[in-house]
Amino acid sequence: MRRRDLPTEFHASAPMRLDFAGGWTDVPPFSAREGGVVVNAAIGVRAHVALTLGGKLLRFVSEELGETLECANAGGLTGHDKLPLLMAAVRMFPVLGGFTLTTRSDAPAGSGLGSSGALGVAVVAALTRAREETLSRQDLADHAWQVEAIEAQLPGGKQDQYAAALGGFHRLTFRDPDVGIEPLTLDPAFAATLERQTLLCYTNTSRASGATIARVMRAYERGDREVTAALHGLKETGAAMAEALRAADLGRVARLLSDNWKHQQALDPGMRTADMERLEAAAVKAGALGGKAAGSGAGGCMFFIMRGDARVAAKTVVEAGNGTRVLPLAWATEGVRTW
């Protein structure tokens, strides 16, 4: 690879996701032993990466976290608590010479929208483009998961990376190491209604999912009956959600969201925070048909299917206080893109 033959700037952007059902079943060891089913949809909230080659230092800038880290050489890419995902990505996909790697997120930190998975996909896409390598979207997702879960040792499943790489609605099946990809083609009118009536809220409470994931999977490994039953319930709900979306059955989609949330709460006592409880009550008052936490729970975002236009309900929810923020929602048919 000859630096003078390459452009000096590379950009990538990848969407985050709403996990409609089955989340947690993509996480090992459950996904390896029993297989998982997840239904998710990419959304217009994205992670952004800019890679500028040049200079003497390896410089990392996380605008969303307000953190900057500089290394004199590749030897400085280990032993840091800061920005572990970015460090891990550059260890796996090094580029020649100095650079500045800048990241930005449309979502609050710890949102539960799969922001680290989307960021990982975008970073790997930018780095491989700089290395003149071409990867399929599935390979991008797989490599981004390896960066996060193995190299950076941040536990989690694969659904976030696949949503970010692919875009759109998908039914994903997991039997490690294999991932089955089944696009879900929704009736256009139903997709528009679903978008219009989905209310996405940030609880104003950030959370780090790693500790919760580790705690739940330890309970599963020691044979905890309640946790194991909840994981199987989540898997069944994932399969049912795919059918409800195909059938354009909004009421059933809403009920399954709530079913999923009940199973999710059975995984860990800290899954539902006081802020989440208050947000749920406000959403029900505003006409929620069903809803759940986005991602692993214990803070971050929640989303609800409303009886009517979510924009009308948003006013009631925000007026309930607690610092709740309503986030914009649009389905994203396009996955990761580079330029």
Regions flagged by a language model, labelled:
Residues 96-102, 133-140:
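Short secondary-structure capping/junction motifs at helix and strand boundaries
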Residues 299:
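Glycine-rich active-site/cofactor-binding loop and its immediate structural neighborhood
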Residues 113-137, 165:
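DPxDG-like acidic metal-binding loop motif
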Residues 72-80, 110-117, 134:
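Short gly/ser-rich anion-binding loops that grip negatively charged ligand groups
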Residues 69-74, 98-109:
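Glycine/charged-rich beta-loop-alpha catalytic/anionic-binding loops adjacent to active sites
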Residues 107-111, 289-290:
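Short pre-catalytic strand/loop immediately N-terminal to key active-site residues, enriched for Gly-Thr
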Residues 1-21, 26-32, 40, 44, ...:
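C-terminal nucleotide
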